[in-house]
């Protein structure tokens, strides 16, 4: 995000479009750009946690430089309509970036089908080593300028100088390979277990709300709302369960 924005340097296109539910890895760079003169627009989501397409269509225009929308939300697991948003972006000559950190390793991710220009992943999200990630850059825009954030050697086509982390790169590649080998089989089983858990809870707890239940979600994520219950107090009374009150990461 910062590299694309720095290359434009407040030229004709100075609008960045993102959503209100992004990870801080997206929101904080966007806030930083806003403080330096960029027009940053935050898209709302509907009651299911899905980005409102009509809002996206309305704000993406000829001034838009980049649209950055996550592929899957890290709290609800809800999948976002990346393909449609990419279409809006490309109609106006803007680039589409998606943060796919939560999705890769859980569902099939096809950059050609999504029609994204930029896609970022992080290895530790799918049992790879910590401290290594990857950025996919569509071949169609590889000749365009993305400014580096640091300077030094010419590694990684000059975008990220520095000695390559070979063990991390190998680990990321192997983690991708292993995840791909079991993606469908494990996805079906985890989805079955998730649904079974939610069905049991719904039968026993009146007023329970499952966030994103009626839209496409990651199979491994369940976001639950318990009415009239303090979530932190509830967790303290269930020390043997791995639960969180916020981001799944």
Where are these regions (language model features)?
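Pyridoxal 5′-phosphate
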Residues: 1-249
């Amino acid at each position: 995000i910062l590299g694309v924005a720095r290359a434009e340097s407040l030229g004709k296109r100075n609008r960045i479009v993102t959503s209100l539910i992004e990870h801080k890895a997206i929101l904080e760079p966007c806030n930083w750009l806003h403080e330096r003169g960029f027009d940053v627009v935050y898209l709302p989501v509907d009651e299911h946690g899905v980005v409102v397409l009509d809002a996206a269509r309305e704000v993406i225009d000829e001034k838009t430089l980049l649209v950055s929308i996550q592929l899957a939300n890290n709290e609800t697991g809800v999948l976002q309509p990346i393909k449609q948003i990419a279409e809006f972006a490309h109609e106006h000559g803007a680039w589409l970036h998606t943060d796919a950190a939560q999705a890769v390793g859980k569902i099939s991710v096809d950059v050609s089908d999504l029609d994204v220009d930029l896609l970022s992943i992080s290895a530790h999200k799918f049992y790879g080593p910590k401290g290594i990630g990857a950025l996919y850059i569509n071949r169609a825009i590889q000749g365009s300028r993305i400014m580096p954030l640091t300077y030094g050697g010419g590694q990684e086509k000059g975008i990220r100088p520095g000695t390559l982390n070979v063990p991390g790169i190998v680990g990321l590649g192997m983690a991708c390979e292993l995840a791909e080998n079991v993606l469908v089989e494990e996805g079906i089983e985890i989805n079955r277990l998730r649904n079974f858990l939610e069905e049991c809870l719904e039968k026993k707890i009146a007023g329970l709300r499952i966030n994103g239940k009626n839209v496409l979600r990651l199979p491994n994520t369940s976001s639950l709302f318990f009415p009239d219950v303090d979530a932190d107090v509830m967790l303290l009374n269930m020390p043997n369960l791995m639960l969180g009150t916020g981001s799944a990461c």
